[in-house]
Amino acid sequence: MKKNLRIVSAAAAALLAVAPVAASAVSTVSAATTINASSSAINTNTNAKYDVDVTPSVSAVAANTANNTPAIAGNLTGTISASYNGKTYTANLKADTENATITAAGSTTAVKPAELAAGVAYTVTVNDVSFNFGSENAGKTVTLGSANSNVKFTGTNSDNQTETNVSTLKVKLDQNGVASLTNVSIANVYAINTTDNSNVNFYDVTSGATVTNGAVSVNADNQGQVNVANVVAAINSKYFAAQYADKKLNTRTANTEDAIKAALKDQKIDVNSVGYFKAPHTFTVNVKATSNTNGKSATLPVVVTVPNVAEPTVASVSKRIMHNAYYYDKDAKRVGTDSVKRYNSVSVLPNTTTINGKTYYQVVENGKAVDKYINAANIDGTKRTLKHNAYVYASSKKRANKVVLKKGEVVTTYGASYTFKNGQKYYKIGDNTDKTYVKVANFR
């Protein structure tokens, strides 16, 4: 069944008019915000912390009234996305504030979008939000949550109790399959100063020099484990993010901890409830810092090495190259100008891989498979059938032996052909270093 999501709203929420990803519509029949989805949209994964992932995306522009720049009115725009079973649907909310409230952190005084200031953390609260799962889901219990930790829910839970500003909310759908919430709030929304063009950079703590990549080292405990906090400390003690303004560097907060967890997740490494994980020998963390002033950001890739954890090695075999061979990458493109000369040996993975219809061996260096491949024809050869009886030659003028290969015989040749002094082309035959060649013209 095709999932459909639409939003019904009048003056719904100081959020933006952006084209929806999924089928959606905006109307003015109700002052509330309603998200509709088909019955198959409910996530039934019992391991999930919540069934429905609700993620508002909000951006704000700060008002500018400086004399030397054009006047800019502040504004707040955005979308609400709901994710079910790995699919995301985005709905638009109207760009006004009739049923939304903007407040500065620590204040209950409402702020108009036109008056938003740069560098201030705001909370946007969207009132009267409903999720419609259809009458076929009437009476079911679902849990609402968000991957964004700044998103909170207020409403009546499935036990008929009011919960305020909670990260997840378990609700019972009504007779129409609708979950009704008092509000959804998004904290730490910053208005961007569009007249500020200063960039964010990462710096070395010791030298003060700008850096574009980094490296740190941490040791594992006697069980081969490292705590995320130790990696955070190692990175933050060596590098910091800052933005130059008013003749000084203003530090910017980096997402170091989240970046570490994301890097480990990419390697399918679990982090336990107290932050410990089974450490690999190395992994790369992409630390990002974003300015709350103008929205500029920078990313610093940091290689984390755990020296007392052995680097894993892959099984490899040694293969003799029977024909001069170039290296190729995973897309079958030449890697530099280096080549392996014939009769030398190279370490490769035991099994071949196919790239663009051709068979290759992946190269192993220092116990690790690298992005370098050698055409298998230069190692294993290619089986070809003779269409004529053929002699075996050592050179253009001299036979290698008295052997006569018979028509119809299958012979293994290695690599591309060679052109001899007589202008004719020959294939190398024989898995050895002997000078044994057969004319290309003798093969089918």
Curated annotation (Swiss-Prot):
It comes from the Bacteria. InterPro entries: S-layer_prot, SlpA_C_lactobacillus, SlpA_D2, SlpA_N. The S-layer is a paracrystalline mono-layered assembly of proteins which coat the surface of bacteria. GO terms for cellular component: extracellular region; peptidoglycan-based cell wall; S-layer. This is S-layer protein. It is found in: Secreted, Cell wall, S-layer. The keyword Signal applies. Keywords: Cell wall, Glycoprotein, S-layer, Secreted, Signal. Its main location: secreted. The gene is slpA.
